[in-house]
Regions:
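Conserved catalytic region of serine esterases and O-acyltransferases that act on ester linkages
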Residues: 307-380
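Sec-dependent N-terminal signal peptides
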Residues: 4-13
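Sec-dependent signal peptide cleavage junction
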Residues: 18-106
Length: 380
């Protein structure tokens, strides 16, 4: 009996163990099923990711479309701005050409030394004569103006003398120390190669200054010749505009009257500047015409000493102021307003002093601001 009882108990225990095993197995199966279910959820996530990628792709496409549209807009805006800038430049150039507003971009700025070659005639001497007084007054010891002088020399003659190499010129230097003759006889070709000039100024024979055909093609050819032999890396070319004769000058009959001569000069110079390599104009002719409109400056014979050449003091100072404001002032960042020189003796007619200095400076500065028009503000 006892054995049977023990056998029954053992059998019961076996059955209980099998049940537990099945329960565990079922649990594993459930876990596996759960895992399987979990694994089956992965495609769902993949679908979500695919949707996200599709959304991102759409967004990228939209951004690219927007960027392309923006790029086209930017390009259109850029082209419009470029066209507007180009038109503004053309209008500015046309304004400078029509009115003569000075454009000083070609000039050197604040050089250690400024060397200017002035190729001309007696009118060039008149323009330079008062420069030493101004330069000395301002303490400017680093400016030299070399004047290559041949009396009554025209542009055509300058060209012919260059080709022939004739030594028919005199060479002068003007600086803060005064005037000195460097050579009694020299040629234009030799002097062109003497120094690395920063600026070269040309002057026409006064009687022909209102005739454009007397300028070209001679001036352009001389500029070409200079460019071949020049020592400087960059040279600015300027032209000194001649003044009209006094109303009683004998040679004025060619132009009928003074005002017409001045207008003819302005027309010829403006046309010459457009056709040649001239960078800027020194408007001495307009400065003189401004001064002739000012009652307080009506001395000598309309600012001339013989009807054609400028008067020795007020006239020469006026020309020097115009030269200074056109060339030296923008290069060296100085103003003619700083000058307080007294030019001439108290007994000299037209002496420059505190009574007329500012008026003469005004006439010069107004001409530099507008090369081809008489200013209503000259007397202020």
């Amino acid at each position: 009996m006892k054995r049977l009882i023990w056998i029954g108990m053992l059998f019961a225990l076996c059955l209980q163990g099998m049940a537990q095993t099945n329960k565990t197995t079922n649990g594993q199966t459930l876990v596996v099923r759960k895992t399987t279910v979990t694994k089956k959820t992965v495609p769902a996530n993949t679908t979500k990711q695919g949707s996200t990628k599709q959304t991102q792709a759409k967004q990228t496409t939209t951004k690219q479309s927007t960027a392309n549209a923006s790029g086209k807009t930017d390009k259109t805006t850029f082209n419009q701005k470029t066209a507007a800038d180009t038109q503004a430049q053309k209008e500015s150039a046309a304004l400078q050409q029509s009115t003569g507003y000075l454009y000083n971009a070609p000039l050197p700025y604040l050089p250690q030394k400024l060397d200017v070659l002035f190729i001309g005639n007696s009118f060039s001497i008149d323009t330079s004569a008062a420069l030493p007084s101004i330069l000395s007054s301002l303490g400017m010891n680093n400016v030299n103006v070399y004047v290559l002088y041949k009396g009554g020399c025209s542009m055509k003659q300058h060209y012919e003398f260059y080709k022939s190499g004739e030594k028919v010129y005199e060479l002068y230097r003007y600086n803060s120390q005064g005037e000195v003759q460097l050579e009694k006889t020299t040629s234009i070709g030799e002097v062109m190669q003497r120094f690395p000039y920063d600026v070269v100024v040309w002057q026409q024979y006064s009687l022909e200054s209102g005739d454009y055909t007397s300028y070209e093609p001679y001036l352009s050819k001389l500029i070409q010749a200079y460019n071949i032999t020049k020592l400087s890396a960059r040279t600015t070319f300027a032209f000194n505009e001649t003044w009209a004769y006094a109303s009683n000058a004998k040679n004025l009959t060619r132009y009928k009257n003074q005002k017409n001569m001045w207008k003819s000069i302005c027309t010829a110079v403006r046309k010459m500047k457009a056709a040649s390599g001239i960078d800027l104009v020194i408007p001495c002719g307009t400065a003189v015409q401004n001064a002739r409109e000012v009652e307080a400056l009506k001395v000598d014979n309309e600012l001339t000493r013989d009807g054609t050449h400028i008067s020795n003091y007020a006239g020469r100072y006026l020309l020097a102021c115009t030269f200074f404001e056109s060339i030296i002032a923008p290069c060296m960042n100085r103003s003619i307003r700083e000058d307080n020189t007294t030019y001439g003796k108290s007994t000299d007619v037209g002496q420059v002093n505190d009574t007329n200095r500012r008026l003469l400076q005004n006439c010069a500065r107004l001409a530099v601001a507008n090369n081809y028009e008489i200013s209503e503000f000259a007397g202020q």
